[in-house]
Regions:
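Conserved PLP-enzyme active-site core in the AAT-like
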Residues: 42-200, 264-265, 341, 355
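General small-molecule cofactor/ligand-binding pocket signal
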Residues: 33, 86-90, 272, 301
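Conserved C-terminal alpha-helix-loop-beta "cap" of PLP-dependent enzymes
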Residues: 244-326, 331-338
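ATP-dependent carboxylate/acyl-activation modules
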Residues: 9, 197, 201, 214-219, ...
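Short, small-residue-biased leader/transition segments that mark boundaries at the very start
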Residues: 1-14
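Active-site C-terminal subdomain of aminotransferase-like
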Residues: 162-263, 267, 271-274, 345
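Short loop-beta-helix segment that forms the pyridoxal 5′-phosphate
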Residues: 15, 26-45
Length: 358
């Protein structure tokens, strides 16, 4: 009875879920996506399980970049334990792809904000047959080359930046996208386009069995939880703004981050990278900077010897001015681009009329 009622309640939302899947596929450069998962860390754990299944369970080592968000690393480690998988966290430059490795997870941009792709590591991963999983920032993909265009097999992340408040960490709708050939291993709900008895287009939940109840530990996924309301919010945010406005939002975020970067460098501070989207890591000179920020309700990532700062789509020029004041430096306009030429996005996205009509 519960299943029937739930299915009926989903009926009117299916077109919006389809929009969500289209949005994710377009931005990540992948071929197929589900209609949300619980959160980004869970999506990473699901992607690891999916990669293990693709290897037929014959390999047991999973590599994770040390510059993946720490909460994601922790959830992946926890999920790996009952599956008897070994998780190795290291710098991607040190990854060794032997016969026991079935997949790897990297962050794009990295947790420290760096926008880069380790081409040599990618070549080794692909040559070994390892499944490449990328945890991506959805808004950044309006400006930087999507993972699907540089070799990713699975892309995961969350859609919080598309109109959903931070909410002290959640809830937010996560996503997972992959290649068409891996669709049978994709966890979660998938909305497909079919035909009704009259030959009219009809939407339905595709490739779905309640196997988590039937196959138990051998199921594609044991996590049934989606984030329906949050996926609807993120989807409609994209429908409302469309590709051009989303790009403008991303450009504004990147511009404000670039102002902070150029101001810090001009003021004599050491910043971790010239390639970034919305996050930078700056060497700490004055321990009182964090104290000043906290008094004004700015929360930095304290690395000990350095500070991590992220700018989001709600930030204003006034906010950046306050950050600059904390460091006692001057506002300096940026020169040049913060994205490497090889990683600038050149492909179109959100071209469907639903994203360009309202």
């Amino acid at each position: 009875a519960t299943t029937e009622i739930y299915t009926l309640s989903l009926h009117d939302a299916l077109p919006i879920f389809l929009n969500f899947q289209t949005m994710i596929c377009d931005l990540t450069g992948m071929e197929i996506a589900n209609s949300s998962l619980l959160d980004e860390a869970t999506a990473a754990a699901e992607a690891m399980t999916m990669a293990c299944n693709l290897a037929r369970g014959k390999k047991h080592v999973f590599l994770v970049s040390d510059d993946v968000n720490p909460q994601t690393i922790n959830v992946v480690k926890t999920r790996a334990e009952p599956l008897n998988l070994k998780v190795i966290v290291d710098n991607p430059s040190n990854f060794r792809f032997d016969e026991n490795v079935f997949g790897l997870l990297i962050q794009y941009p990295s947790a420290e904000g760096v926008v880069s792709v380790n081409s040599k590591m990618m070549e080794k991963a692909q040559a070994s047959g390892s499944v490449v999983i990328v945890a991506a920032d959805l808004l950044s993909l309006c400006l930087i080359k999507p993972p699907g265009e540089w070799g990713a097999d699975i892309v995961i992340g969350n859609s919080q930046r598309f109109g959903v408040p931070m909410g002290f960490g959640g809830p937010h709708a996560a996503f997972i996208a992959t290649k068409e050939k891996f669709k049978r291993c994709l966890p979660g709900r998938l909305v497909g386009v079919s035909q009704d008895v009259h030959g009219n287009p009809a939407l339905r939940l595709a490739m779905q069995t309640r196997e988590q109840h039937i196959r138990r530990d051998r199921a594609t996924s044991n996590i049934c939880t989606a984030q329906v309301l949050l996926a609807i919010m993120a989807s409609m945010y994209a429908v409302y703004h469309g590709p051009n406005k989303l790009r403008q939002i991303a450009e504004r975020v990147n511009y404000l981050t670039s102002v902070l970067h150029s101001s810090l460098v001009s003021g004599g501070y050491t910043v971790n990278s010239k390639s970034f989207f919305d996050t930078i890591k700056v060497a700490k000179k004055d321990k009182k900077v964090i104290e000043k920020a906290l008094k004004k309700k700015f929360n930095f990532w304290d690395y000990g010897d350095s500070i991590g700062i992220s700018i989001d789509e709600t930030a204003t020029n006034s906010d950046i001015g306050k950050l600059i004041d904390f460091f006692e430096i001057e506002w300096v306009e940026p020169v040049g681009s913060s994205t490497p030429p090889s990683l600038v996005r050149r492909s179109d996205y959100l071209t469907h009329p639903v994203f360009n009509t309202y």
